[in-house]
Amino acid sequence: MKLHSRFLNQVATQRYVQQGVFVVTALFLTHGGFSVLHAQEASAITVQEKIFGTPDQIFEKAVSLFFDAKPGESAVVFDQLIQVQPECQPGLWQRGLALYYADRFVEGQKQFELHRTVNPNDVENPAWHYLCVARATSPENARQHMLAVGQDLRVPMKQILELYQGDGSEENVLMHAARGDSQQQRNQLCYAHLYLGLYAEVNGNIGKAKGHILQAAETYSMDHYMGRVANVHARVRGWLLPVE
């Protein structure tokens, strides 16, 4: 998935809109009543930030814990972020990944369903939704309830989606991932092996899953968010990858 660097700016805009609604409603009150309500809202935010930190600090802590292969702790911190700033939850696909590796699959499923409302064209979102549902119920049920998605032009995301939907193949994913120049191939093969490994794992083929994940984490390693997810996966599963 794409790491949205403007994450907190988007949240700030959402908060501004919500506060605008609050102000319009408050105009029907006395000036004194408005002041009390505004002060109470500000006070609640201040208390939460004193307990957990600012939204930026909480987000950074959650991500850091995740990449330290501590998804359970990471998920708890992401929960704190939602408590401090509830309007940010739809954008938090990173929380969905932490929930998956923390074995909180139903909550992960709901996170990816919510994320679709703000990011409807990212194939990785229905893929992770599938993985959560497959672990919570079964791969067959997950396939029947896959989220609809728009067009994602990244290679080999279309082929990965087809595989998860039951219409594609591992060979087709790898064939498309091996196209382009050497740098493109490395990135594409990192994604391909990550999602092939995830798919193999939820379908019970642990040996194949390990092979794919280690290729994504080592042979075709990338330092972007999803490349590092492969590393986290290997470490969480105890597949003998050194700690970063």
What are these regions (language model features)?
Residues 53-80, 84, 192-199:
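Alpha-helical segment of the N-proximal tetratricopeptide repeat
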Residues 80-83, 114-117, 184, 218:
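Conserved structural position within tetratricopeptide repeats
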Residues 67-68, 101-102, 135, 202, ...:
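Register position in tetratricopeptide repeats
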Residues 64, 98, 132-134, 199:
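Residue-level signature for tetratricopeptide repeat
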